[in-house]
Structures are given as structure tokens and as C-alpha cells.
Amino acid sequence: MTTVAMQQASAKMSTSAVAVGWVLRLIAAVILLQTLFFKFTGAPESVYIFTRLSEFISHLAAPIFGTNFAAMVARSEAFSRVGSGVMELVAAALLIWPRLPWAGAILAFAATAGAIASHLTFLGIEVQGDHGLLFGLANTVVACSIGVLCIYRAQLPFVGRHFQ
């Protein structure tokens, strides 16, 4: 979509849609940015979560790819923790950038949908006594991402022209 087409799509949005869009974008971005400190510094809760993730994937991969691959995956906690943080940093930046909120919403949705799936499978809703806070924050980001995608649907590549 060209810059002119994006501006025309944005110009057609009501003031309230623009305001709600910004609120949803900022909520999701703040939540994503807040978690980066814990991921990048190797906070014990983050290390615990990504160690469990690595063990879970290793357990699933062993029958398919063999024990050597599974052992390598089991040791990938730091890589997956920092990689997840980088993905969330990019998502937050794209959410805030006025030209690409839809891209940030897609990336934020993907990252946090994975977190929700982890909570619902092997982590549990409550992780190390957090009373479900991380699970709730992930659900909030997913809800905000869906809202952003609905509001900025006209800017989506390939399909956006059908919403104008």
C-alpha cells in the first residue's frame, strides 16, 4: 500500500477510532516494553519460564529429531528468552510507529499468543506465585492487538483495500 493510500485510509477513520487505536497501541506497547527488563537481565522468573519452555520443546522434539537435538534445545533458554524479548521490542516499536501499527499488532499477537499457549499447556496460569499476572498481561496484549488490527484493517497489505 502506498503512503498516499495509507494516509487516505487513516483520514477516513473517525476521531474516536484514532483515539481508541492509540490507547490500544500504547497499552500493548507499554506491557511489551515493561517485560523486556526481566527478559534481557535474566530475572529468575524469566529464566524459569524459558527453561520450562526449552524442556517442554526438548521433550517433544526427542522422538522426532533425536536426543542430541533435544539436548541442544534443552540448553537454549537464554536464546529463546532474549529472542522473545527482541521480538517484543520490535512489536512495541511498530505499534508506536504511526505507519505500521498493523505490523506491530500482528507481531505482538504472535508473541503473546505463544505465551498464552505456554500458560495453558505446561506453565499453568499462575507462575511462581504471580497470581496469573503474566497470563492476564498476555491476554491484554492479545485483546489490544486484535483491536488495533480491527481499527487499522484498511492499512493491511493485500486485504486492506477491501475494507475501504
Q: Each predicted region: which residue ranges?
A:
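Membrane-interface extramembranous regions
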Residues: 2-164
